[in-house]
């Protein structure tokens, strides 16, 4: 006689075991129609799941995040159903959900074209429109393997052989004649899977291992209703317009090439932005009392063995040999900073020591994961490490948080998601130490009045951490900043200080990054601003142009005046119509265009226009120089008179 407790505390008693869907029907026909699955005692279950004992139950509908994920997972099965009908010889691998959608890896003896993808999507919609029921069946391990052997599915058999215990009872989901294996839950009926779009095909190795066969990965997105799908596709279109790779090429910021995969060739204009970011962060380092250091590019493997990187991180490290010694190019800066700390005896009076570096790091990321500036192999971190006592953790973390928000606000990022990652199961140190560390981070967040999400067990083995994710104008999250406590590395590298009682103690190390990878941050702000960088970051801040050849000398004079006060200025003296020049520099996103005609020469002025088409009128060169200098000095986000 199960008693079901609902989220509002009310209870319903049944005289027999009852399914999730039957409970929903007992509550009301409308809820039953909307039921996708249920959360029974906190665990997601299919709508057909039978509850035999007293339990708590939350009904999952398309309005819930869980409901949307289940829809997406079922759309992956729908994709499998459709592709099997169109290409009977295809071998199905895995089809999980991802952010905003799903994918399925398939093994097919020819490359899928866009026409194929369109046909698969059309068949998916035809199948979904029949509103067929999805039937779940529990079978023995051997029955599951026999099923997939008969169906010629070697990848499903491999999953059973390598990942599922022989005593398990796998769940097979039947989509009419198509069968897939999954932990679930899935939708009870395909009427929930009507709003989807297949997006692209990419290569993916089976098991993510380059030694295995390359499969074709079909990506798709799925939503609860037509409106959500349309809004998402609109956001994708806007994101495509803002793609930093496209804008980077149009603005001649950088390029990448096959001979140096994942490495950036910075062009003059892109490097100008890079250096401006470094200059800005340096002003903040001074303000927050950091010292700036520079560590070596590579170090002997002996050091990396001490840190544990050689044992746990070797696949991501580039190595080289010389004179019978093996070296690793640094993937991170922290071991080098500990070496600097270790030079000379340190006292508790010297702490905290805040050590910052624009460190050039390299990681051997898989080639398939590389993506413009967002995922590279060679990058520069605005990295810092703070050596302090346990008593100083809260105050130092508070200072780090203030610095994070100080810097992000300059770029217009005010919507920041904060996450606190706590102790994992496998960790070093005592529970008391972790209690103090987590309490210190939580207190620092509270001190700054920040709401945060706790990520249980997501901390590193050597300490808890705070993550800061920027939400951009398209609602995407970019995880950039981290404040990470480390109780392990200083001890592994023999870092000590003389405590107040004259004993030797190991300092706590706080890893602190704000921009993270500068390369990636440039990619983020390129997309955030759509290439319309604020004046202080713009590679060229103003272009001075003539109307006819007779104004050329005046244009040169104006440009020199502006350059002499530190502004980045170019001239355009081409024998082209001024409207053509304005259009061209508008496309180049130059903040200000200064037009010099006979009238401006006679008045000793310049006519100023913005890249958004605003006519600001005429100014003396001195007036305009002061306006632009003030904008640069204060790092304003908007141009003059810009909404």
Curated annotation (Swiss-Prot):
One of its GO terms (cellular component) is cytosol. Its main location: cytoplasm. Pfam families: HGTP_anticodon, TGS, tRNA-synt_2b, tRNA_SAD. Binds 1 zinc ion per subunit. Disulfide bonds: none annotated. Residues 1-61 form the TGS domain. It is found in: Cytoplasm. Residues 243-534 are annotated as: Catalytic. Its cofactor is Zn(2+). It catalyses: tRNA(Thr) + L-threonine + ATP = L-threonyl-tRNA(Thr) + AMP + diphosphate + H(+). Gene3D superfamilies: 3.10.20.30, 3.30.54.20, Anticodon-binding domain, Bira Bifunctional Protein, Domain 2, Threonyl-trna Synthetase, Chain A, domain 2. Zn(2+) binds at residues 334, 385, 511. Keywords: Aminoacyl-tRNA synthetase, ATP-binding, Cytoplasm, Ligase, Metal-binding, Nucleotide-binding, Protein biosynthesis, RNA-binding, tRNA-binding, Zinc. InterPro entries: aa-tRNA-synt_IIb, aa-tRNA-synth_II, aa-tRNA-synth_II/BPL/LPL, Anticodon-bd, Anticodon-bd_dom_sf, Beta-grasp_dom_sf, TGS, TGS-like. Its EC number is 6.1.1.3. GO terms for molecular function: ATP binding; metal ion binding; threonine-tRNA ligase activity; tRNA binding. GO terms for biological process: threonyl-tRNA aminoacylation. Catalyzes the attachment of threonine to tRNA(Thr) in a two-step reaction: L-threonine is first activated by ATP to form Thr-AMP and then transferred to the acceptor end of tRNA(Thr). Also edits incorrectly charged L-seryl-tRNA(Thr). Belongs to the class-II aminoacyl-tRNA synthetase family. Homodimer. This is Threonine--tRNA ligase.
């Amino acid at each position: 006689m199960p008693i079901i407790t609902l989220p509002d505390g009310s209870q319903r008693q049944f005289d027999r075991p009852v399914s999730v869907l039957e409970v929903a029907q007992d509550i009301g026909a409308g809820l039953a129609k909307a039921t996708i699955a249920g959360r029974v005692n906190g665990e997601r279950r299919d709508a057909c799941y039978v509850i035999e004992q007293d339990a708590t139950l939350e009904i999952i509908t398309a309005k819930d995040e869980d409901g949307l994920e289940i829809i997406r997972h079922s759309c992956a099965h729908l994709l499998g159903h459709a592709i099997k009908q169109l290409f009977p010889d295809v071998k199905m691998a895995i089809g999980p959900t991802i952010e905003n959608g799903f994918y399925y890896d398939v093994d097919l003896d020819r490359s899928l074209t866009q026409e194929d993808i369109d046909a698969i999507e059309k068949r998916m919609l035809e199948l979904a429109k029949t509103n067929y029921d999805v039937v779940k069946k529990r079978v023995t391990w051997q029955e599951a393997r026999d099923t997939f052997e008969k169906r010629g599915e070697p990848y499903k058999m491999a999953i059973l052989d390598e990942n599922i215990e022989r005593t398990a009872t796998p769940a097979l989901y039947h989509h009419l004649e198509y069968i897939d294996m999954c932990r679930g839950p899935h939708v009870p009926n395909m009427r929930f899977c009507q709003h989807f779009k297949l997006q692209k095909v990419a290569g993916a190795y089976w098991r993510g291992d380059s030694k295995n066969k390359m499969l074709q990965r079909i990506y798709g997105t799925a939503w609860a209703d037509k409106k959500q799908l349309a809004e998402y596709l609109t956001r994708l279109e806007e994101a495509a317009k803002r793609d930093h790779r496209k804008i980077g090429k149009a603005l001649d910021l950088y390029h990448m090439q096959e001979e140096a995969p994942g490495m950036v060739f910075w062009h003059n204009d892109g490097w100008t932005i890079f250096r401006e970011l470094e200059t800005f962060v340096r002003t903040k380092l001074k303000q927050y009392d950091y010292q700036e250091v520079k560590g070596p590019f590579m170090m002997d493997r002996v050091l990396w063995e001490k840190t544990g990187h050689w044992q746990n991180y070797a696949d991501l490290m580039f190595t080289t040999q010389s004179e019978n010694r093996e070296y690793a190019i640094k993937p991170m800066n922290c071991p080098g900073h500990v070496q600097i700390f270790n030079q000379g005896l340190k006292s508790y009076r010297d702490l905290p020591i805040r050590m910052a570096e624009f460190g050039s790091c390299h990681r051997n990321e898989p080639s398939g994961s590389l993506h413009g500036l967002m995922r590279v192999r060679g990058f520069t971190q605005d990295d810092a490490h703070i050596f302090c006592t346990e008593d100083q953790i809260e105050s130092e973390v508070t200072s780090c948080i203030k610095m994070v928000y100080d810097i992000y606000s300059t770029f217009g990022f005010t919507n920041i998601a904060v996450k606190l990652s706590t102790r994992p199961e496998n960790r070093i140190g005592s529970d008391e130490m972790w209690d103090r560390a987590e309490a210190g981070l939580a207190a620092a967040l509270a001190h700054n009045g920040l709401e945060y999400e706790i990520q249980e067990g997501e901390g590193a083995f050597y300490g808890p951490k705070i993550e800061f994710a920027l939400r951009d104008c398209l609602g995407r999250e970019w995880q950039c900043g981290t404040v990470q406590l480390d109780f392990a590395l200083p001890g592994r590298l023999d870092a000590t200080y003389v405590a107040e009682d004259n004993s030797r103690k190991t300092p706590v190390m706080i890893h602190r990054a704000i921009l993270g990878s500068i390369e990636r941050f440039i990619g983020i702000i390129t997309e955030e601003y759509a290439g319309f960088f604020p004046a202080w970051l713009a590679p060229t801040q103003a272009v001075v142009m003539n109307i006819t050849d007779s104004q050329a000398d005046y244009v040169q004079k104006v440009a020199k005046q502006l350059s002499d006060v530190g502004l980045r200025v170019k001239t355009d003296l081409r024998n082209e119509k001024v409207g053509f020049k304005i259009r061209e520099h508008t496309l180049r996103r130059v903040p200000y265009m200064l037009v010099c005609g006979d009238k401006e020469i006679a008045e000793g002025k310049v006519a100023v226009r913005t890249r958004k088409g605003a006519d600001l009128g005429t100014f003396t060169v001195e007036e305009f120089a002061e306006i632009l200098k003030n904008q640069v000095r204060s790092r304003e986000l908007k141009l003059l008179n810009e909404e």
